[in-house]
Amino acid sequence: MAKEDAIEVDGIVQEALPNAMFQVELENGHTVLAHISGKMRKFYIRILPGDKVRVELSPYDLNRGRITYRMK
């Protein structure tokens, strides 16, 4: 079975939570719980509240996501 395509959306980090989790408000107004992707963790990319980020959402659970990119 092929992996389903993730939905990519942009948002702003509202709050940093324990265990590298973040509360992210998406452009459409929804709020999701997101964690950092492995490559961002590996290269110690810091994410702070107020940062604009790109989030991948699974089509199966739209309340959780993975932060894949931090905008400059």
From Swiss-Prot:
Residues 1-72 form the S1-like domain. Keywords: Cytoplasm, Initiation factor, Protein biosynthesis, RNA-binding, rRNA-binding. InterPro entries: NA-bd_OB-fold, RNA-binding_domain_S1_IF1, S1_domain, TIF_IF1. Disulfide bonds: none annotated. It is found in: Cytoplasm. The keyword Glycosyltransferase does not apply. CDD domains: S1_IF1. Belongs to the IF-1 family. Component of the 30S ribosomal translation pre-initiation complex which assembles on the 30S ribosome in the order IF-2 and IF-3, IF-1 and N-formylmethionyl-tRNA(fMet); mRNA recruitment can occur at any time during PIC assembly. This is Translation initiation factor IF-1 2. It comes from Oleidesulfovibrio alaskensis (strain ATCC BAA-1058 / DSM 17464 / G20) (Desulfovibrio alaskensis).
